[in-house]
């Protein structure tokens, strides 16, 4: 209240990190002001100016506020998986779309897997942003759990969408079939398959015998068996 009258009131909000040196907040010229992340930990006050009926410039300053307290801001955006879900491929976590007004710390990535895309289990065999896919991953879908601690000490956690089910790639047969026994009339030859392996697994094994007179041209022997 001013007995000399009050003209148009000008409002200016100010900010200080120590309560002594004050700076005007650009654009903060309304009677209400909403603090944001950039103001956390600093004090605010408002300065009111007007010209009274006698032409005098009058200025009033409010007491300083207490330091602005942080309110956790939830992250926006989400991590996503890139790469091809197939054996011998790789799934890579892309975190470029994650943003947090409170700041983003160092990412920690763990993996989960599921054969149904509903019942997820921790997959402790892999950590980090890249999952190299091998035969052991075939038939499962994977997702990544991305976590970090923001600038104010709040731990945030985000999930990627599930990958497609990892597809199998045919793995070549390894090893060789060994023949034991004497190659003589009346003797028995045995096909030893103990050294044969296949990363895809061996569901069944069929043995067929062939004969050749010159080692180049082969024909099937009608009576075949394991020996």
Could you say what each language-model-derived stretch is?
Residues 1-227:
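Ser/Thr/Pro/Gly-rich low-complexity disordered regions
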């Amino acid at each position: 209240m001013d007995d000399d009258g009050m003209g148009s009131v000008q409002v200016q909000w100010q900010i200080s990190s120590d309560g002594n040196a004050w700076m005007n907040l650009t654009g903060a010229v309304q009677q209400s002001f909403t603090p944001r992340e950039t103001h956390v930990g600093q004090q605010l006050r408002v300065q009111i100016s007007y010209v009274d009926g006698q032409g005098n410039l009058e200025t009033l300053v409010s007491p300083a506020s207490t330091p602005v307290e942080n309110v956790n801001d939830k992250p926006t955006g989400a991590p996503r998986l890139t790469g091809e879900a197939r054996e011998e491929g790789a799934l890579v976590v892309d975190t470029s779309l994650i943003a947090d007004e409170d700041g983003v710390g160092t990412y920690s990535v763990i993996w989960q897997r599921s054969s149904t895309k509903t019942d997820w289990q921790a997959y402790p065999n892999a950590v980090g942003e890249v999952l190299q896919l091998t035969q052991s991953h075939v038939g499962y879908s994977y997702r990544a759990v991305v976590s970090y601690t923001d600038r104010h000490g709040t731990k945030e956690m985000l999930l990627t969408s599930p990958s497609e089910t990892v597809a199998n790639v045919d793995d070549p047969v390894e090893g060789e079939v060994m023949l034991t026994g004497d190659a003589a009339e009346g003797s028995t030859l045995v096909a030893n398959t103990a050294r044969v392996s296949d990363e895809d697994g061996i569901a069944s094994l069929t043995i067929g015998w062939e004969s050749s007179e010159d080692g180049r041209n082969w024909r099937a022997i009608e009576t075949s068996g394991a020996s």
